[in-house]
Regions:
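Short carbohydrate-recognition loop motifs
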Residues: 49-72, 130
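Short, aromatic/His-centered strand-loop micro-motif at the edge of beta-sheets
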Residues: 136-158
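Beta-strand-rich interaction surfaces with strong enrichment in secreted/lumenal proteins
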Residues: 72-79, 144-151, 195
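Ligand-recognition surfaces built from glycine- and aromatic
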Residues: 186-215
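Short tryptophan-centered beta-strand motifs in secreted/extracellular beta-sheet-rich domains
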Residues: 155-165, 170-172
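Short, solvent-exposed beta-strand-to-loop segments that form ligand-recognition rims
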Residues: 173-193
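Secretory/extracellular carbohydrate-interaction modules
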Residues: 66-133
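Extracellular carbohydrate-recognition regions
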Residues: 21-45
Length: 215
């Protein structure tokens, strides 16, 4: 075989290898299935259930332990994703008088002490309504902290997270907006699983879909 043909063949095979390594991941958990909850790893002290095609955080977790982090997570069982898009509808069921209500999307989950989370809340302050990383110590905010509150009521909200672990880009879109409500850039954790949760409140999630590329 001629050298040029060999080079072209090598390039073609390398392309196939890269494409195979980047085979996309896609999951839309059937929340109507009797065993739907088994698709998730429960982390923390909250109580979860599946009913009426919803993943329900029935009982809020209680923050505690050696580091400050969300107290109730349900992490989808999958391999680690380098790039991920998470779409979900969520509704807070915290009492009306709870102004700092929150619900979360988890991503880059490696372990109970190492993950990212998007914290959508009814107020914005140092600890609410932002993007945070837990890296074997108390959670740390990584966005600029200027976004207006995104979860001020008990209505359904559509949320989309886009995350690229190679560049560190993190963007969160709420209720179909063209511009992200929250954004950050961080590469502390390159890849991990995704999930849902709350720091210390209750809520409901439905129409969950996850797509992306594995590590």
């Amino acid at each position: 075989m001629r050298p040029q043909a060999l080079a072209l063949t090598a390039t073609f095979l390398a392309g196939l290898t890269i494409h195979a390594a980047q085979k996309p991941f896609s999951s839309r958990p059937d929340l109507a299935a009797p065993d739907a909850l088994s698709r998730f790893t429960v982390d923390g002290s909250g109580s979860w259930a599946v009913q009426d095609r919803m993943l329900i955080l029935e009982k809020a977790g209680t923050p505690g332990g050696p580091i400050r982090r969300p107290s109730a997570l349900a992490v989808l069982q999958s391999g680690p994703l380098v790039r991920a898009t998470v779409q979900v509808e969520m509704r807070s069921t915290a009492p009306e008088d709870v102004k700092n209500r929150d619900l979360e999307i988890i991503f880059g989950y490696e372990s109970p002490t190492r993950f990212y989370y998007v914290h959508l809340a009814g107020i914005t302050d140092a600890n609410h309504n932002g993007i945070f990383v837990v890296d074997n110590k108390d959670r740390r905010r990584i966005d600029d902290g200027t976004a207006p509150p995104q979860l001020k009521d008990r209505e359904w909200h559509s949320v989309r997270l886009e995350r690229d672990g190679t560049t560190g880009r993190i963007e969160v879109f709420v209720d179909g907006a063209a511009q992200p409500a929250l954004r950050a850039t961080d590469t502390t954790i390159g890849a991990g699983r995704v999930g849902l949760g709350s720091f210390d409140d209750t809520g409901e999630f439905r129409s969950l879909s996850v797509s992306g590329y594995p590590k």
